[in-house]
C-alpha cells in the first residue's frame, strides 16, 4: 500500500510545525502550563459553533477538539479568514487533528476507525497545544447531550475548566 501523497505529507508537516509554534516550554517531566482562563464556558450546537469560523473580523475564532471548544483567536495568523488552518475552525475538527488532515471529509468529531497512532497523536496535540495554549470557552452539545437530548453519561463534571482535566474520553 502506498504512503500518503507528497502534497498531503507536506500539509501534515506544515500543520505540525504551525501547531508547535509558540508552545510554552516545560521542564522535563513537567506538564504544559494551562491557558489563561477566559469567560465562563457554555454549550455550543454545531450551528452556533459555525458562527465562530473566523469569517467575521469582530468575532472570536473558535474550534473544537474532542468536544472541547477552544478560543484560538490568539492564533489568528493560523486560524483566521484565509489562513492555512481556517478549515479547522467553526466546528469540531477532532478527526482532522488526529490525522493531521485538512481534507473536508476529516473535519468532523467522528473518531471511528482511527489508528492507535492517530489517537495518540490526537491526545498529544490536544494536551500540548490546545489545552496548553488556548482558553476553553465551552463544549459541543454532542459531548454533553445524546442525539435524543438526554444527558451523555460519559461527560464528567471534572472536565470543566476550573478542575484539572484528567480524563478526556
UniProtKB/Swiss-Prot annotation:
Residues 1-28 form the signal peptide. It comes from the Eukaryota. Coiled coil: none annotated. One of its GO terms (molecular function) is metal ion binding. One of its GO terms (biological process) is negative regulation of appetite. The modification N6-acetyllysine is found at residue 133. InterPro entries: Cyt_B5-like_heme/steroid-bd (IPR001199), Cyt_B5-like_heme/steroid_sf (IPR036400), MAPR/NEUFC/NENF-like (IPR050577). One of its GO terms (cellular component) is mitochondrion. It holds the Pfam family Cyt-b5. Its main location: secreted. Acts as a neurotrophic factor in postnatal mature neurons enhancing neuronal survival. Promotes cell proliferation and neurogenesis in undifferentiated neural progenitor cells at the embryonic stage and inhibits differentiation of astrocytes. Its neurotrophic activity is exerted via MAPK1/ERK2, MAPK3/ERK1 and AKT1/AKT pathways. Neurotrophic activity is enhanced by binding to heme. Also acts as an anorexigenic neurotrophic factor that contributes to energy balance. Non-classical progesterone receptors involved in extranuclear signaling are classified in 2 groups: the class II progestin and adipoQ receptor (PAQR) family (also called mPRs) (PAQR5, PAQR6, PAQR7, PAQR8 and PAQR9) and the b5-like heme/steroid-binding protein family (also called MAPRs) (PGRMC1, PGRMC2, NENF and CYB5D2). The cytochrome b5 heme-binding domain was proven to bind heme, although it lacks the conserved iron-binding His residue at position 79. Interacts with PINK1 and PARK7. Belongs to the cytochrome b5 family. MAPR subfamily. This is Neudesin. It comes from Bos taurus (Bovine). The lineage of its organism: Eukaryota, Metazoa, Chordata, Craniata, Vertebrata. The gene is NENF.
Amino acid at each position: 500500500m502506498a504512503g500518503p501523497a507528497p502534497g498531503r505529507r507536506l500539509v501534515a508537516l506544515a500543520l505540525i510545525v504551525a501547531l508547535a509554534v509558540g508552545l510554552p516550554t516545560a521542564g522535563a517531566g513537567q506538564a504544559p502550563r494551562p491557558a489563561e482562563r477566559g469567560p465562563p464556558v457554555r454549550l455550543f450546537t454545531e450551528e452556533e459553533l459555525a458562527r465562530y469560523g473566523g469569517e467575521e473580523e469582530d468575532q472570536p475564532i473558535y474550534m473544537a477538539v474532542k468536544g472541547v471548544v477552544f478560543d484560538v483567536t490568539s492564533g489568528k495568523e493560523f486560524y483566521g479568514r484565509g489562513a492555512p488552518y481556517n478549515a479547522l475552525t467553526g466546528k469540531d475538527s477532532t478527526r482532522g487533528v488526529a490525522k493531521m488532515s485538512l481534507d473536508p471529509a476529516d473535519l468532523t468529531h467522528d473518531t471511528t476507525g482511527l489508528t492507535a497512532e492517530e489517537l495518540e497523536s490526537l491526545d498529544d496535540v490536544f494536551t500540548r497545544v490546545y489545552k496548553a495554549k488556548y482558553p476553553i470557552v465551552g463544549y459541543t452539545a454532542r459531548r454533553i447531550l445524546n442525539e435524543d437530548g438526554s444527558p451523555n453519561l460519559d461527560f464528567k463534571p471534572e472536565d470543566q475548566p476550573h478542575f484539572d482535566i484528567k480524563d478526556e474520553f
